[in-house]
Amino acid sequence: MKNYDELSSMEIDTLREIGSIGTGNAATALSQMLGREVNITLPQVRIMGYNEAIDWIGGPEAITAGVLVKMSGEISGIMLSVQPLEFANLVLESILGLSAKDYSELESMETSALVEVGNIMISTFINALAGLSGLTVDLTVPAFTIDMQGAILAFGSQSDYIMTIGGDFICDNKQVPCRLLLSPDIRSLNFLLRKLGVDSGE
């Protein structure tokens, strides 16, 4: 059974393809929800160590919002949508006609909008993964938190390695960061690769 750091180049390329398709679907879902055209730059999909992933999303002490969903069924693990303030304001301006200078200004109506958007993006991504692999994946009710990024990632961490999916959403000639993190447990990672037909069985 392979760990993340033992994946072959073909296996990593397959995960990248899933990440690209899933992120494209998430951008389409976001566009429909906001009622605005939203495109995404070519996403960068990487397998990162835990500490590298924290630095990638902005460092351990930066405050951010996160929507986390746990996966069960034929795949177990977590998926996390990190919502930098620029992304949060894109959502809030589109849905509620307001923006926030920092996360402390958010009230229940604003956080509910962010949770709904994060949940739809994650669900759309996972549905794409399930469709490509033929697997059944169940998702929990999303959890929402505002905290230091290191704490958010520690809460959801399933292993020492994480699949990171990053790009920029483009809306009204503005670019806002898209940061998604997928962490199936090791058993699920290997099962997924077998279902996709690329597990070398080493």
Give the positions of each predicted feature.
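Composition-driven recognition of glycine/serine/threonine/acidic- and proline-rich low-complexity segments
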Residues: 2-27, 31-202
